[in-house]
């Protein structure tokens, strides 16, 4: 380091404290980066890499970004999971002796972004912290933008991952002592930036006082210390830490949240197409965030659910009041994040105008809710604090359209402060004198084109064209600037007035900034009240959203029972919306004593998976307090939902379809209770036929005998339908399909009993495979069916058992997966194929269909079809 210049030595000393971050080092109007930071940043940001002399023998790599446009560059780096340390000059370069003093004023990380495009208005930006104790994990969350704080204790790391996934935390703070396997699992499965914090807190803030448990306090304090260390500013807006337990809400594991597409779709990872997308009729950003939180954590206490339902029902019954409420809420800005900006000290005058405009709507909202004919609505109205004193303060202090900058004046109203009014009078009088000066000088000189102007470089001046210079009195005018066609002058009187005006304007700007800072401090005292008001507004917003969607889409109020499921003409809410004008086929679902499990058979693409998801989404809608898409709905309150639905297979992670199946099935089998809902879609399809059938039956029997949960189990193993005779609580249902003129028609209707046949070849026909290939497949199918009938055992369950034993005994002598197309018979002459068709058939025969998802099969069929065309 000794060979470098003093400035580079300063850079290296600061950089040593922020090894895991890009150091934005302020040099004049730029943030500069050096050495490895510069090389990496030039690639990530696609900016020019240069170099400079740093005192050593080799030039130092360097790149930089303008400070006034740094936000977009910081957002790019944060979006990629990096951290950025902002290093500012903290003394005036003019008064500095030697190198200007610099220090890091903020560390921006994925979990601590406060504004800009990196923050989505309808989403929280939670940062998480994970601690390991003897028997549990401690998990804490904080959102700096809203001040929300949560903490819980969890036994299993899988549940920790699921919670982090639910809230979408982009950064996880852990101790360096946390097990490396745990850290690796958190990073891989949550896709978040991992940060380390092992410092102890100097003092414990009051926001943790209500937690009680030392483990919960320690968990949150790790996060709090990290935030204090990185943000280096007030965290006064952080709300009291709320302790919660997973058992207080319906548990939906990570797999199931993905499978059900609650907040984002599986394939595109977008909101559009998810349940959140369907429901989001909120009018405020904070309402949008609360809606997502409610979807992630459905209620399990009947009283809480019914309170929401009753207000939704009341809002449905009062259309005009609801529409008025929606219009009022639309004018309410993001109170939570405005409060956060106030606490952070980066709120500007326009932010406070937004706060003022929001507060103007509150009295009318309070009156509207209080006018609703329901005691719970009236009780909510009573709790709304309009913050009238804050509104009056903002009304008195601020102009309606203040500038973005806080140091250019025009922020504070006339009459708010006597000294400010005095300065403004002095400035106005001086400008009036200057306005009169122009007319006086024209009359005095006789030059009609003479004018008085101002610019920031030369101040006030008298401008005269060169053709009229001879008319000026000698000795009275002092030349100030020469232009091509004119000269600019100043007089002693003008110079004197200019000094008075500029002094007054400088005093105005300084005093306005001082008064605004005082105003900001006064507003800071209202933060707890504003956060409580934001909570009330966001809840009203979500409830009106439920009422609006329920009325517009003809949903019904669900009833709750202890054990009965009775959904009459239920609809999948998202599919129904996507189909729009097309005719949606509703389906009913009845479960209860003697009918706890439904075994669903039917052809691929007939709607089995949609029917199963429909049941889960209706249950979730009911338990968040919304009405549901059905003619009638009676439901138990489920404590957990588990799904195994193939569309969510993620083979990129290196796990086969079958392994994913087994892991998800295990999760349900180990953790489900009799009050849970289980959805199993074609379990066993990821392995050989006999293995798959044996496992599917074993899982059905285990859930039936040992868990007793309400279960929807779809299968393509038609042999399993005979289990209805053996298991008291299992019933067969099927998706109806009919053949018409040799073609299959999917009716998408759920009917009692088992499906009488499969329609796999018809699906291949829909994909437009060659006629010869389809004909050959039909021939092979007849041969297989004929052979199966000759060897058929007395009952399907016995067949499964014997098949499994046979598979185990012969596995050493047989290939891992037999092709259904292996046969000694050649393709007959009447179905002779072209060379192209033969090549496609060869590819088709080589496909390992039993180890592919339906979607993968359809994609392969589409590819083969394109080859033939």
Swiss-Prot record:
InterPro entries: DNA_mismatch_repair_MutS, DNA_mismatch_repair_MutS-lik_N, DNA_mismatch_repair_MutS/MSH, DNA_mismatch_repair_MutS_C, DNA_mismatch_repair_MutS_clamp, DNA_mismatch_repair_MutS_core, DNA_mismatch_repair_MutS_N, DNA_mismatch_repair_MutS_sf. Keywords: ATP-binding, DNA damage, DNA repair, DNA-binding, Nucleotide-binding. Belongs to the DNA mismatch repair MutS family. This protein is involved in the repair of mismatches in DNA. It is possible that it carries out the mismatch recognition step. This protein has a weak ATPase activity. GO terms for biological process: mismatch repair. This is DNA mismatch repair protein MutS. ATP binds at residues 602-609. PANTHER family: DNA MISMATCH REPAIR PROTEIN MSH1, MITOCHONDRIAL, DNA MISMATCH REPAIR PROTEIN MUTS FAMILY MEMBER. HAMAP family: MutS. Gene3D superfamilies: 1.10.1420.10, DNA repair protein MutS, domain I (3.40.1170.10), MutS, connector domain (3.30.420.110), P-loop containing nucleotide triphosphate hydrolases (3.40.50.300). GO terms for cellular component: cytosol. One of its GO terms (molecular function) is ATP binding. The lineage of its organism: Bacteria, Bacillati, Bacillota, Bacilli, Bacillales.
């Amino acid at each position: 380091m000794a060979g470098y210049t003093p400035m580079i030595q300063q850079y290296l000393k600061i950089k040593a404290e922020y090894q895991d971050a890009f150091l934005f080092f302020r040099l004049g109007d730029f943030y500069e980066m050096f050495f490895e930071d510069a090389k990496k940043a030039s690639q990530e940001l696609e900016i020019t890499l240069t170099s400079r002399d740093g005192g050593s023998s080799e030039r130092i790599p360097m790149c930089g970004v303008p400070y006034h446009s740094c936000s977009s560059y910081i957002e790019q780096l944060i979006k990629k999971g990096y951290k950025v340390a902002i290093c500012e000059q903290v003394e005036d370069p003019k008064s500095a002796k030697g190198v200007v003093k610099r220090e890091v004023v903020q560390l921006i990380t994925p979990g601590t972004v406060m504004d800009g495009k990196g923050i989505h208005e309808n989403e929280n930006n939670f940062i998480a912290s994970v601690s390991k104790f003897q028997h549990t994990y401690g998990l804490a969350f904080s959102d700096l933008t809203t001040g929300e704080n949560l903490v819980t204790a969890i036994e299993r790391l899988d549940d920790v991952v699921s919670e982090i996934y639910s809230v979408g935390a982009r950064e996880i703070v852990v101790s360096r002592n946390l097990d490396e396997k745990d850290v690796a699992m958190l990073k891989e499965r949550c896709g978040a930036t991992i940060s380390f914090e092992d410092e102890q807190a100097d003092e414990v803030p009051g926001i943790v006082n209500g937690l009680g448990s030392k483990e919960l306090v320690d968990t949150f304090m790790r996060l709090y210390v990290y935030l204090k260390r990185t943000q280096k500013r007030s965290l006064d807006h952080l709300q009291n830490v709320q302790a919660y337990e997973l058992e207080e809400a319906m548990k939906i594991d990570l797999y199931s949240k993905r499978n059900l597409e609650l907040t984002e779709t599986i394939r595109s990872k977008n909101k559009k197409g998810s349940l959140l997308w369907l429901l989001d009729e909120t009018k405020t950003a904070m309402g949008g965030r609360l809606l997502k939180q409610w979807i992630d954590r459905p209620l399990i206490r009947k009283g809480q659910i019914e309170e929401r339902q009753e207000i939704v029902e009341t809002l449905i019954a009062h259309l005009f009041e609801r529409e008025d409420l929606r219009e009022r809420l639309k004018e309410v800005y993001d109170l939570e994040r405005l409060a956060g900006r106030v606490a952070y000290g980066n709120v500007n005058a326009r932010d406070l105008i937004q706060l003022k405009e929001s507060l103007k709507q509150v009295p009318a909202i309070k009156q509207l809710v209080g006018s609703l004919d329901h005691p719970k609505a009236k009780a909510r109205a009573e709790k709304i604090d309009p913050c009238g004193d804050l509104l009056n303060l903002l009304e008195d202090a601020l102009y309606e359209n203040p500038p973005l900058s806080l140091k250019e004046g025009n922020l504070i109203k006339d009459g708010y402060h006597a000294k400010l009014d005095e300065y403004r009078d002095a400035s106005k009088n001086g400008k009036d004198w200057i306005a009169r000066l122009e007319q006086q000088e024209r009359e005095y000189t006789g030059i009609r084109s003479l004018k008085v102007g101002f610019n920031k470089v030369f101040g006030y001046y008298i401008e005269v064209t060169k053709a009229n210079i001879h008319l000026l009195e000698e000795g009275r005018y002092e030349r100030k600037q020469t232009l091509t066609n004119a000269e600019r002058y100043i007089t002693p009187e003008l110079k004197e007035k200019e000094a008075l005006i500029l002094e007054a304007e400088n005093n105005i700007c300084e005093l306005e900034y001082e008064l605004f800072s005082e105003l900001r401090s006064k507003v800071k005292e209202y933060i707890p009240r504003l956060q409580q008001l934001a909570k009330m507004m966001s809840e009203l917003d979500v409830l009106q959203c439920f009422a609006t969607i329920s009325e517009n889409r003809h949903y019904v109020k669900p009833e709750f029972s202890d054990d009965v499921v009775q959904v009459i003409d239920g609809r999948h809410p998202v599919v129904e919306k996507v189909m729009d004008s097309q005719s949606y086929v509703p389906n009913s679902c009845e479960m209860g004593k003697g009918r706890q499990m439904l075994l669903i058979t039917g052809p691929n693409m007939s709607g089995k998976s949609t029917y199963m998801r429909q049941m889960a989404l209706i249950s979730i809608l009911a338990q968040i307090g919304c009405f549901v898409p059905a003619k009638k709905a009676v439901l138990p309150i489920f404590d957990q939902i588990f799904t195994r639905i193939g569309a969510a297979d993620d083979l990129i992670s290196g796990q086969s379809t079958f392994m994913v199946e087994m892991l998800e099935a295990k999760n349900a089998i180990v953790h489900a209770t009799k009050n849970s809902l289980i959805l199993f879609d074609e379990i066993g399809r990821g392995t050989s036929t006999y293995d798959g059938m044996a496992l599917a039956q074993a899982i059905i029997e285990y859930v039936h005998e040992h868990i007793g949960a309400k279960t929807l189990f779809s299968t393509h193993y038609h042999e399993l339908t005979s289990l209805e005779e053996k298991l008291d609580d299992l019933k067969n249902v099927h998706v109806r399909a009919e053949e018409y003129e040799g073609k299959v028609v999917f009716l998408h209707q759920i009917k009692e009993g088992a499906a009488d046949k499969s329609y796999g070849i018809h699906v291949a026909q829909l994909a437009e495979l060659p006629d010869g290939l389809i004909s050959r497949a039909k021939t092979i199918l007849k041969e297989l069916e004929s052979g199966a009938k000759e060897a058929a055992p007395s009952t399907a369950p016995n067949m499964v058992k014997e098949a499994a034993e046979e598979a185990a005994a012969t596995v050493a002598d047989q290939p891992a997966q037999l092709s259904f197309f292996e046969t000694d018979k050649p393709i007959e002459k009447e179905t002779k194929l072209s060379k192209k068709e033969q090549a496609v058939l060869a590819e088709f025969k080589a496909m390992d269909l039993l180890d592919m998802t339906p979607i993968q099969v359809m994609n392969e069929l589409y590819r083969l079809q394109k080859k033939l065309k």
